[in-house]
Curated annotation (Swiss-Prot):
Cellular localisation: Mitochondrion matrix
UniProt keyword annotations, A-Z: Acetylation, Mitochondrion, NAD, Oxidoreductase, Transit peptide, Ubl conjugation
Protein name, UniProt field: Aldehyde dehydrogenase, mitochondrial
Pathway: Alcohol metabolism; ethanol degradation; acetate from ethanol: step 2/2
Lineage: Eukaryota, Metazoa, Chordata, Craniata, Vertebrata
Family: Belongs to the aldehyde dehydrogenase family.
Length: 521
């Protein structure tokens, strides 16, 4: 177990998020194995492991060092075809999966959650090795949310159902909620385990089958979970996992004529491509959770200490690699100077380093491409006239670490105020009135999330209604629960994940009407 100082550090991390997971337990964190053994690096189809048909592999890299962890089978169109064929067979009428009681689907999901909990320490270490996020976060935050998500949807398995309908005439009418069928799911690298759970939970609870493409940057934890899916007792073909690249494996899923639905989390640019491919093929249903440039509005009456800490967390959590990061911090002018001063001090105190060290708050960026992209945005900010207040460069000689960076005097037209940076770069903007900040906050192609910090309930309610965003947090940030839907307006995507709303995208509603001799009330 971690010593008391390490546990205190874990508690500090959780206080920053102030219940990112709605009710994160403060608990002892087992010491990690910093070199976890790699058990699975192949393609998972029909509950079996396969090399890629092409025999190609790709390296997955430790972002803390730049060293190759291992090579992983590189799936492409032929492998996706084989996975879809297996999924389609598992979905045939009369198959073991289709014949399974809804309550038993819930039992399997609960069993999967139990197995993940059993191997939680290993999975947290593997996630940190492959992704770079602090181990304390992997264990206390990501894995906790994974377990809650799977167990939440396990509970829905036998409770999401149709209705009887009192139509006119001598008829009996009712609805059925039926599974869509073969669901293609494409998950990102910033929260590999969590995004896998967000996708699998509602799909499996409602009786679908899955072909999942995992990110080439972070395939390892998803592949380990694949083996737990088999151990839990899911029939062959119900879940198939293909590691590979977006332009090959991802594109094959999006355009496949025998895939009934695709769910994607990632960039808006790729979301466009998936939407087009889905439309050009078989008009498959699409759920997209895309980019954001979320406004975080600090009113002059806000609790300053809390607002500074939460604004810091809103931007820097997960190395800034969050689609809903509070990446436009709007501060009312009469507290602007003090807020900026405190925010810079907080950023300078942020501990960057080895993600397996319990004191670390910030690990590396995911890869060299993102590392260079973020440094390019920092250069752009300086060139366009924003004031660099701290950070601005690499934080280590090895790996993809970037200093916590804060810009002041940011204007709406600057590149760093318009585009998603996806890194530890905070932009602070000044405003005068509520009406002004509403207009500026909504003047974005994105609409994923927003936040308001104020002690005035009228202001909070007014801003919550006015902001064009799928989620608005009041006096908090990044508070998620499996019960609450998440998704975006505008170019931040379509559809919702989590909660009861998250089940809708995975079901078809069928109306059945039966002629009866006589209907009585």
């Amino acid at each position: 177990m971690l010593r008391p100082a390490a546990l205190a550090a874990a508690r500090l991390v959780l206080r920053q998020g102030r219940r990112l997971l709605s009710a994160a337990p403060t608990q002892a964190v087992p010491a990690p194995n910093q070199q976890p053994e790699i058990f699975y690096n192949q393609i998972f189809i029909n509950n079996e492991w396969h090399d890629a048909i092409s025999k190609k592999t790709f390296p997955t890299v430790n972002p803390s060092t730049g060293d190759v962890i291992c090579h992983v089978a590189e799936g492409d169109k032929e492998d996706v075809d084989r996975a879809v064929e297996a999924a389609r067979a598992a979905f045939q009428l009369g198959s073991p999966w289709r014949r399974l009681d809804a309550s038993d689907r819930g039992r399997l999901l609960n069993r999967l959650a139990d197995l993940i909990e059993r191997d939680r320490t290993y999975l947290a270490a593997l996630e940190t090795l492959d992704n770079g996020k602090p181990y304390v976060i992997s264990y206390l935050v990501d894995l906790d949310m994974v377990l809650k998500c799977l167990r939440y949807y396990a509970g829905w398995a036998d409770k999401y159902h149709g209705k009887t309908l009192p139509i006119d005439g001598d008829y009996f009418s009712y609805t059925r909620h039926e599974p869509v069928g073969v669901c293609g799911q494409i998950i990102p690298w910033n929260f590999p385990l969590l995004m896998q759970a967000w996708k699998l939970g509602p799909a499996l609870a409602t009786g679908n089958v899955v072909v999942m493409k995992v990110s080439e940057q972070t395939p390892l934890t998803a592949l380990y979970v694949a083996n737990l899916i088999k151990e839990a007792g899911f029939p062959p073909g119900v879940v198939n996992i293909v590691p590979g690249y977006g332009p090959t494996a991802g594109a094959a899923i999006a355009s496949h004529e025998d895939v009934d639905k695709v769910a994607f989390t990632g960039s808006t640019e790729v979301g466009h491509l998936i939407q087009v491919a889905a439309g050009k093929s078989n008009l498959k249903r699409v759920t997209l959770e895309l980019g954001g440039k979320s406004p975080n509005i600090i009113m002059s009456d806000a609790d300053m200490d809390w607002a500074v800490e939460q604004a810091h967390f809103a931007l820097f959590f997960n190395q800034g690699q969050c689609c809903c990061a509070g990446s436009r911090t709007f501060v009312q002018e009469d507290i602007y100077a003090e807020f900026v001063e405190r925010s810079v001090a907080r950023a300078r105190s942020r501990v960057v380093g080895n993600p397996f060290d319990s004191r670390t708050e910030q690990g590396p960026q995911i890869d060299e491409t993102q590392f260079k992209k973020i440094l390019g945005y920092i250069k752009s900010g300086k060139e366009e006239g924003a004031k660099l207040l701290c950070g601005g460069g690499a934080a280590a000689d090895r790996g993809y670490f970037i200093q916590p960076t804060v810009f002041g005097d940011v204007q709406d037209g600057m590149t760093i105020a318009k585009e998603e940076i996806f890194g530890p770069v905070m932009q602070i903007l000044k405003f005068k009135t509520i009406e002004e900040v509403i207009g500026r906050a909504n003047n974005s192609k994105y609409g994923l999330a927003a936040a308001v910090f104020t002690k005035d309930l009228d202001k909070a309610n007014y801003l919550s209604q006015a902001l064009q965003a799928g989620t608005v947090w009041v006096n908090c940030y990044d508070v998620f629960g499996a019960q609450s839907p998440f998704g975006g307006y505008k170019l931040s995507g379509s559809g919702r994940e989590l909660g009861e709303y998250g089940l809708q995208a995975y079901t078809e509603v069928k109306t059945v009407t039966v002629k009866v001799p006589q209907k009585n009330s």
